[in-house]
Amino acid sequence: MLDATPENETLLEVNNIEVIYNHVILVLKGVSLSVPKGGITALLGGNGAGKTTTLKAISQLLHSERGEVTKGTIEYRGQSVSGLNPSDLVKRGVIQVMEGRHCFEHLTIEENLMTGSYTRRDGAAAVAADLEKVYEYFPRLRERRKSQAGYTSGGEQQMCAIGRALMSRPETILLDEPSMGLAPQLVEEIFGIVKDL
């Protein structure tokens, strides 16, 4: 979605990071991974293995939970993300869809989707075109676009969260447990869409 680059380029590089919470609790040690342009990378591990913490470290969301990367580096497109706030990272093309169904319950589905475009400066026509793309990926959201998100199903809320992320025009989407609590048919549908992206 951003500028054209060679397909084998590494977009995201996590090198030997260590994460500590509350200045004393070591949660991650020696975590490294590379995410190539156009690729899908999965973090696998049991409960408490540090998958969510790794994603929050990449997204710069640790500080709100008194966590910090104390060793190692995280680079996106060859530049350190250390010290960036999450909205700056979104502007650079990285967004995270959090574990669970994080929607603004009092807003409609369409209002939720539109909040994903808050960092964009490419005009209303481009935003409207991307909203149509989200509705093509998730036809149910078009049907429910005027419904308050809090009154939609868990699957619709998960689609809304992913759709909202897509509205920022990301180059890299970090999905934390995107299938949690969803019906198998819906899981297959969501993973099919992720693969198409």
Report the location of each language-model feature.
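A short, flexible loop at the N-terminus of ABC-type nucleotide-binding domains that lies
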Residues: 6-14, 18-30, 37, 62-67, ...
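ABC-type ATPase nucleotide-binding domains, specifically the catalytic core motifs of the NBD
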Residues: 22-23, 41, 62-65, 109-129, ...
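The feature captures the beta-strand-to-loop junction immediately N-terminal to the Walker
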Residues: 44-46
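Short coil-to-helix segment of the ABC ATPase nucleotide-binding domain corresponding to the Q-loop/switch region
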Residues: 55, 106-116, 145, 175
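Conserved ABC transporter NBD signature motif
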Residues: 69-79, 92, 126-131
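ABC ATPase signature
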Residues: 107, 151-152, 165-166
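Conserved ABC ATPase signature
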Residues: 148-152, 156
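A short, proline-enriched helix->beta-strand linker immediately N-terminal to the Walker B motif
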Residues: 167-171
